Amino acid sequence: MATDPADPVPSRSLRIAHLTTVDMSLALLLATELEADVAAGHEVFGISAVGPYVPRIEARGVTHVPVASLTRSWDPRRDLEACLELFRTIRGLHLDVLHTHNPKTGAMGRVAGRLAGVPVVVNTCHGLWARPEDRWRKRAFVYVLEALAIRFSHYELFQNAEDLATLRPVLKRGRYRLVGNGIDLNRFGPDPEGRRRVRAELGVADDEILVGTIGRRVREKGMAEFLDVAARLRQRATFGWVGPVDETDPTAGVGHTDAVRFIEERTDMPAVYSALDVFVLASYREGMSRAAMEAAACGVPMVLTDIRGCREIGRDGEHLLLVPPHDGVALEKAVERLLTESGLRERLAAAARTRALAAFDQHRVANASLSTYAAVLAGSRGLGRHRRGDSDLR
């Protein structure tokens, strides 16, 4: 949603911390928010488990604060240790604002921040850690945990309207806002020279079609379905997967790996997206897919799964093609359609690029966060009642 120009902004320098489980989230997903906070003159901290992305975080003028006991996986004993360590860490920082992210640190951080006496505790829901098709025990756990954590926050920000609708019954009146998600549109765009360079590195000829996906190599990204499609269509296109192995996912070892070129994480992502002729995301769960937004901004035709977090990227048949999750046959048909119909590829690519420029500006999201901090500090209850925004396609 667009930020109201009348929204307040913090009138003094604040001590702001963003909390995530791993440092990769701070460095890649929250880069623009961190930069906006620093540019506004605030003292900014990034709290997470330590990792290889810490130098990139600190290069942005952000102080990284490690929490050794934080892990992505759920473990009662370690999670209790993490809660206690988080509480001590947050209390010692004497923060004005704690902004929590990710399912696990979102829940822990809201409670720890409020108990530590932080004046403003804000949470962004990047995607509920439960899907409608999940077993009721998992859904009950997630929804009850969120309902409890919400009681400890001052404000809730949502990336997609479906998550907001799910949690609306337990939200505080006037204390939530649909902000959508965004990317750095100054960085992501068509890169013809980068396209030539990356395709040459990969040995992909100009007349070959390159189909790719971007993300961690985990099952919930639709790895099995993508590899199956690659195996069946390997004579008609080259398939690639760009992203790191995730050691926390033991189910990632699926078949047909010989049909795909696995490429480790790269930093020249605009060039990588531009090298693709078709972008595929067969994911089962997304908050609001950053990879899809980046592909759209680079003008790449897309096939996405019809799930929350992907539906917000665009309309089926207008900006992209949507297929049911877990449906390898439908995914194959959609990819094959784009391999066959060059005119459709060109039309979807242009429409996706236009959509990205209109709706996916990360600076708008960062400004919405800053205005939310100011409103809570000022005691305003009028900001952020749910309004239909750019990310709402209905």
Kindly give the residue locations of the regions a language model identified.
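Short hydrophobic beta-strand element within catalytic cores of glycosyltransferases
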Residues: 301-304, 314
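Donor nucleotide-sugar binding/catalytic pocket of nucleotide-sugar-dependent glycosyltransferases
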Residues: 65-68, 147-193
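Conserved acidic donor-binding segment of nucleotide-sugar-dependent glycosyltransferases
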Residues: 316-317, 321-328, 337-342
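Short His-centered aromatic/hydrophobic patch
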Residues: 100-106, 125
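A conserved mid-protein helix/loop that constitutes part of the nucleotide-sugar donor-binding site
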Residues: 27-32, 209, 213-232, 293, ...
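Short, structured helix-loop element that forms part of the nucleotide-activated donor/catalytic region
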Residues: 54-58, 237-263, 344
